[in-house]
From Swiss-Prot:
Core subunit of the mitochondrial membrane respiratory chain NADH dehydrogenase (Complex I) which catalyzes electron transfer from NADH through the respiratory chain, using ubiquinone as an electron acceptor. Essential for the catalytic activity and assembly of complex I. This is NADH-ubiquinone oxidoreductase chain 6. Core subunit of respiratory chain NADH dehydrogenase (Complex I) which is composed of 45 different subunits. It comes from the Eukaryota. The lineage of its organism: Eukaryota, Metazoa, Chordata, Craniata, Vertebrata. Its main location: mitochondrion.
């Protein structure tokens, strides 16, 4: 059952970003990003990463919501363009949706998913030990992995957010 929930959330996640990439109007783009961010947090929490899901929810949906609100206020239109009002926008959305359906069918047919990263040793990561049980805590392991092996991810993410805010401010500033 958990596999189907993650699969459905993943499809909603990708369809949301396909809807964002066809970008009919900034108002709908911000809404789709917020919904996709919430679905992404649900996927993370479904895999047991409640700490990481909470952090993504607080940082992404809390911090970037201010930017989305600001850009929506600066770029409001009296008659915003929707997905079905332009044949090109609708075609891009349907093409992305078709590609997603083809990918889903391919994954369901092959029934194998490979691991992207493999670590040679996890023995020196933090171990949460209660009474010599030898159990790894997912939360402590995730935080340790994020700040030790994934330090470059934190730096790239911070830099990407900074560049994103600067680009948004430049676009909304106008002439």
């Amino acid at each position: 059952m958990m596999t189907y929930i993650v699969f459905i959330l993943s499809v909603i996640f990708v369809i949301g970003f396909v809807g964002f990439s066809s970008k009919p109007s900034p108002i709908y783009g911000g809404l789709v990003l917020i919904v996709s961010g919430g679905v992404g947090c649900g996927i993370i929490m479904n895999f047991g990463g409640s700490f990481l899901g909470l952090m993504v929810f607080l940082i992404y949906l809390g911090g970037m919501l201010v930017v989305f609100g600001y850009t929506t206020a600066m770029a409001t239109e009296q008659y915003p363009e929707v997905w079905v009002s332009n044949a090109t926008v609708m075609g891009v959305f349907l093409l992305g949706l078709l590609m997603e359906v083809m990918l889903v069918l391919y994954v369901l047919k092959s029934e194998e998913v490979g691991v992207v990263f493999k670590f040679s040793s996890v023995g020196h990561w933090a171990i949460y030990d209660i009474g010599n049980s030898g159990v790894f805590s997912e939360e402590i392991m995730g935080v340790a992995a994020l700040y030790s092996y994934g330090a470059w991810v934190v730096v790239v993410t911070g830099w990407s957010l900074l560049v994103g805010v600067l680009v948004i401010l430049e676009v909304t500033r106008g002439d």
